[in-house]
Regions:
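Ligand-binding face of N-terminal immunoglobulin V-set domains in extracellular IgSF glycoproteins
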Residues: 94
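Thiol-based oxidoreductase modules, predominantly thioredoxin-like and allied folds used
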Residues: 48-74, 88
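Short, conserved sequence motifs used for protein processing/export or organelle targeting and
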Residues: 67-87, 100-227
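Boundary at the C-terminal end of the N-terminal hydrophobic targeting segment
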Residues: 2-9
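Local sequence-structure signature of Cys/Sec-based thiol-disulfide redox active-site neighborhoods
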Residues: 13-54
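Extracytoplasmic
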Residues: 17-19, 46-49, 89-91, 146, ...
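Short, solvent-exposed loop/turn and secondary-structure capping segments
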Residues: 34-37, 63-65, 105-107
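Solvent-exposed loop/turn segments at secondary-structure junctions
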Residues: 27-31, 56-61, 100-103
Length: 227
């Protein structure tokens, strides 16, 4: 996998393009998620890929409350389920660039989705920060139904959590790029628009920020800004 990392970060003419966004929906209470967690751990070190771990809360009833889960993360996965006309929610699930998904963590399958997204991606509208307090999304082609602007704050370090109850009782779960905050900044209709960024709170220390411009209701990723 590492051998293709640099190639992924470059377009057909050798210039650097935006990263492919890989989202993992997982749970510390999911007995089948260890391989997916490990895969994202590896992808987090690759150039040309923004790997994000979203902890869902709907497995908490099994006896262990996921320490990173939030209902808005489950709602994001639900939007993908509806957009892609899937039969139900499942973990682990990997969504690549908002375009394609894979239930499970079969490495070759995920690699294929990433490579396809790399071939198909475009840089999209320009995203830029102004005085670290505002985001400006430039003009561009508006997708049918419009688009949403999302702020994602995630922990780039590895987190090891020992599960004390449920199916994974006694196991230590290692997770990377765990999303801690997901905020919808507003809609985008194709014209240049400015958005106010939420201020960094005490819980934001050590977190990285990504801005995702995404077709509405769980659509494809149009542009990405990282800081």
């Amino acid at each position: 996998m590492a051998g293709t990392a640099e190639a992924r970060s470059r377009g057909p003419h050798g210039h650097h393009e935006r990263p492919v966004v890989v989202e993992l929906f997982t749970s510390q209470g999911c007995s089948a998620c260890a391989a997916a967690d490990k895969l994202v751990d590896q992808l987090a070190d690759e150039n040309g890929v923004l790997a994000l771990t979203f902890a869902v809360d709907y497995w908490d009833y099994l006896g262990w409350n996921d320490t990173f889960a939030k209902p808005e993360f489950s709602a994001r996965q639900k939007a993908y389920e509806q957009r892609m006309a899937l039969r139900d929610l499942s973990t682990p699930q990997i969504v690549v660039d908002g375009r394609s998904q894979l239930a499970g963590a079969e490495t070759k399958g995920v690699e294929a989705l990433i490579e396809r997204a790399q071939r198909d991606r475009s840089d999209g509208p320009r995203l830029r920060l102004v005085r670290r307090s505002h985001l400006v999304v430039g003009p561009g082609a508006r997708p049918a139904g419009g688009a949403d602007v999302w702020l994602v704050r995630y922990d780039p370090s590895a987190r090891n959590v020992t599960v004390k109850r449920g199916d994974n009782r006694g196991q230590t779960i290692r997770e990377r790029n765990v999303v801690r905050q997901l905020v919808r900044l507003g809609s985008w209709t194709g014209r240049e628009k400015s958005y106010v960024l939420p201020t960094d709170g005490p819980d934001s220390a050590g977190l990285k920020t990504a801005i995702l411009l995404q077709a509405a209701k769980g659509g494809r990723i149009l542009a990405v800004l990282q800081r």
